[in-house]
Amino acid sequence: MPLFQNATFFTTVNHLRDLPPTSAEIAFVGRSNAGKSSAINALANRTRLAYVSKTPGRTQHINFFRLASHFDYFLVDLPGYGYAEVPESVRAHWVELLGRYLQTRESLIGLLLIMDARHPLKELDMRMLDFFRMRGQPVHILLSKSDKMNRQEQNKTLATVRQALAGYPQVSIQLFSSSKKQGLEQVETVVAGWFAGLEARQADELTDGEPDDRTPDPDSAS
């Protein structure tokens, strides 16, 4: 089964105290209306798993989606940033919720940062990269809506973004289109690698914690 296929909605939370216990999470983040929810739907091969709106700022909570292929693994749709047409109190709550989640969530193992390919590397995108870099975890950038550009424009944008982020070794980048189903396999390969890395680290920790059977028994030496 493909990694994301048949993912299901699990829960939505508005406060960190309500976050569910999970083994591993991959979070989707980006500017409002960059295409986060559309990306989740395309990857899961579902049309209405994550709510898609033409109005920016509709994702106001943290939404969890459980992977059918790995029951303890989750996709997380975070509130979009950069949308000004909401009350200041609401925007302040989003900022606190998003920031504290990214800083403190122990089960978060990687970030999928969605940027509109026609308008990448906005100031808030760069702030997000700098903020998350402190965790030392990988970020994979999806240059969404790339189908709105011709091939020459796509290649130029991809090269420009790669050059601009050369100083971010934990970042990888690709073109992506939810509507045309382009780039899905590449995203799946990247995220599967993150999960495999987590499982390898967990296996190493278990091995390190086991007693060494080769250690001689002091009583047998007498």
Curated annotation (Swiss-Prot):
Residues reported in the UniProt entry to bind Mg(2+): S37, T59
Sections of the chain in a coiled coil: none
Region (Disordered): 201-222
Residues in EngB-type G domain copies: 22-197
Family, similarity comment: Belongs to the TRAFAC class TrmE-Era-EngA-EngB-Septin-like GTPase superfamily. EngB GTPase family.
HAMAP family per UniProt: GTPase_EngB
Gene: engB
Any one GO CC term of the record: cytosol
Gene Ontology biological process terms, A to Z: division septum assembly
Keywords: Cell cycle, Cell division, GTP-binding, Magnesium, Metal-binding, Nucleotide-binding, Septation
Name assigned to this protein: Probable GTP-binding protein EngB
Named cofactor requirement(s): Mg(2+)
Lineage start: Bacteria, Pseudomonadati, Pseudomonadota, Betaproteobacteria, Neisseriales
Matches recorded under Gene3D superfamilies: P-loop containing nucleotide triphosphate hydrolases (3.40.50.300)
Disulfide bond residue pairs: none
